[in-house]
Amino acid sequence: MTTLRVLLAVCCAAYCILAEDVTVPANGELKLMPDQKAGGRLEGQWKISTPDHYYLIVSCGLWSSASGTCKDKILITQGGKTTEVCGEGKNSFYVQQDTNLNTAEIIILTNTPDARAMCTVYSAEKPKEENTF
């Protein structure tokens, strides 16, 4: 049983990506660049937040020569909904904003050596609620 636990821990360490917690300052921006791994693969995972009374605008771009598959992808999770952005042999861009959400998680995983990916996350002040009398 102990050998199995050690083997499982080694496998998890080899294949799991640990998310980096980052905070976007109020009215600020943050560029997210994945780490380059062996064979040119890119990997990155971030848990992002901004202060209360602010929301996140997520903007990601991915280019990959791998067409017809989703070998290279960006996963963007906000408010319990995950969006998958695939390279598929072209430039793929994605912008998401929800004025109710001040957290997000982004995962970038590529298997094609020439793939390029990055995200920029902006913090914006939530709109003021108008009093309706």
From Swiss-Prot:
<keyword id="KW-1015">Disulfide bond</keyword>
<dbReference type="GO" id="GO:0005576">
    <property type="term" value="C:extracellular region"/>
</dbReference>
<keyword id="KW-0732">Signal</keyword>
<protein>
    <recommendedName>
        <fullName>Triatox</fullName>
    </recommendedName>
</protein>
<feature type="domain" description="CUB">
    <location>
        <begin position="23"/>
        <end position="125"/>
    </location>
</feature>
<keyword id="KW-0391">Immunity</keyword>
<feature type="signal peptide">
    <location>
        <begin position="1"/>
        <end position="22"/>
    </location>
</feature>
<dbReference type="GO" id="GO:0045087">
    <property type="term" value="P:innate immune response"/>
</dbReference>
<feature type="disulfide bond">
    <location>
        <begin position="70"/>
        <end position="86"/>
    </location>
</feature>
<keyword id="KW-0964">Secreted</keyword>
<comment type="function">
    <text>May function as an antimicrobial peptide and may be related to the innate defense of the insect in the salivary glands.</text>
</comment>
<keyword id="KW-0929">Antimicrobial</keyword>
<keyword id="KW-0399">Innate immunity</keyword>
<comment type="similarity">
    <text>Belongs to the venom CUB family.</text>
</comment>
